[in-house]
């Protein structure tokens, strides 16, 4: 009886240790899945700029079989839901949207981190004025590229490094907006709301005008965290990724904000 009582006393701390070890392993596994370990060495050699890549693509969809590598710093975040399964990088010459096809990309590729993309086996094309890189789209698709989807495929083509340099938005006036800035983080100031969805909320397309009457649209996904928030009626300054598309039958430049805070009161 005394021996059995001693084993029970020993078993309790042993069980506690085993539980603690299992918890630690579980947390480690989750951490490894959520965020790939960044490379500590210098980034692999980039041999083509994003601007040059855009020139190569033009209005076509191109599938690459050459060992081309681009790189840039992450300029977007899906934390508030206005970006969905994609993120953008900028190398100082141009911007490109990466069709990752994964959720919680702000954990995998945080804003400001340096990422390289190996283009061999990828496709590139332009959608809404923005250069996109992903996989080859199906023949029946209306889009130039498709998502990577698989984490294995993403890791084959993308590498994130421990180099951090947040990209400042390019300050532009509405009349300065041009195709060369599409896919890049820009800021436009002194804008006044002239049209908004029913209820004056962000969800959908809002139209703003500057003091000269030049107009620009702002897009917000219905699933964004701030979609149901009211749009400010004061003059504002708005930061976002520049796109181009049809809004209410009119070809317009469009800003796609990352956060609700990308719209601030302009003084």
Regions found by a protein language model. Give the residues of each.
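Bacterial N-terminal signal peptides that target proteins for export
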Residues: 2-18
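C-terminal motif of bacterial Sec signal peptides marking the signal peptidase cleavage site
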Residues: 26-29
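OB-fold nucleic-acid-binding modules
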Residues: 31-267
């Amino acid at each position: 009886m005394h021996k059995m009582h001693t084993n029970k006393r020993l078993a309790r701390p042993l069980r506690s240790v085993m539980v603690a070890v299992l918890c630690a392993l579980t947390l480690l596994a989750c951490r490894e899945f959520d965020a790939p370990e960044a490379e500590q060495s210098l980034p692999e050699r980039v041999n083509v700029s994003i601007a040059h890549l855009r020139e190569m693509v033009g209005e076509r969809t191109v599938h690459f079989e050459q060992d081309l590598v681009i790189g840039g710093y992450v300029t977007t975040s899906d934390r508030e839901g206005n970006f969905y399964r994609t993120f953008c990088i900028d190398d100082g010459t141009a911007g490109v949207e990466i069709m990752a096809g994964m959720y919680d990309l702000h954990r995998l590729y945080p804003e400001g981190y340096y990422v390289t993309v190996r283009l061999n086996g990828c496709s590139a094309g332009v959608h809404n004025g923005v250069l996109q890189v992903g996989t080859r789209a199906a023949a029946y698709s209306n889009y130039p590229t498709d998502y990577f989807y698989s984490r294995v495929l993403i890791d084959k083509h993308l590498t994130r490094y421990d180099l951090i340099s947040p990209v400042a938005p390019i300050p532009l006036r509405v009349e300065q907006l041009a195709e060369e800035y599409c896919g890049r983080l820009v800021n436009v100031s002194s804008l006044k709301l002239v049209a908004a969805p029913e209820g004056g909320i962000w969800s959908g397309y809002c139209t703003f005008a500057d003091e000269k009457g030049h107009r620009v649209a702002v897009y917000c996904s219905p699933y964004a965290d701030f979609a149901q928030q009211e749009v400010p009626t004061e003059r504002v300054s708005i930061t976002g990724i520049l796109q181009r598309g049809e809004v209410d039958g009119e070809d317009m430049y469009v800003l796609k904000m990352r956060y609700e805070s990308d719209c601030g009161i302009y003084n």
